[in-house]
């Protein structure tokens, strides 16, 4: 149904994207917790 290369790229990018969003949110949380606005 889907090309193996395309499915491989999607399966490879999804965890990286989720991890990137998690790390970004964590860094923003730490930055907001340590610094005053």
Swiss-Prot record:
Q: Name one GO biological process term.
A: photosynthesis
Gene from which the chain derives: petG
Please give one Pfam family short name.
PetG
Role played = Component of the cytochrome b6-f complex, which mediates electron transfer between photosystem II (PSII) and photosystem I (PSI), cyclic electron flow around PSI, and state transitions. PetG is required for either the stability or assembly of the cytochrome b6-f complex.
UniProt keyword annotation of Disulfide bond present: no
What transmembrane ranges does the database entry give? 5-25
Any idea what this protein is called? Cytochrome b6-f complex subunit 5
The family annotation for this protein states: Belongs to the PetG family.
The cellular component terms of Gene Ontology attached to this UniProt record, alphabetical and capped at eight, are: chloroplast thylakoid membrane; cytochrome b6f complex
Q: Which UniProt keywords apply?
A: Chloroplast, Electron transport, Membrane, Photosynthesis, Plastid, Thylakoid, Transmembrane, Transmembrane helix, Transport
Subcellular localization:
Plastid, Chloroplast thylakoid membrane
Where this protein primarily resides, as one coarse class?
plastid
Q: What membrane topology does the UniProt entry give?
A: Single-pass membrane protein
User: Would the keyword Lipid metabolism turn up in this protein's UniProt record?
Assistant: no
Q: Which GO terms describe its molecular function?
A: electron transporter, transferring electrons within cytochrome b6/f complex of photosystem II activity
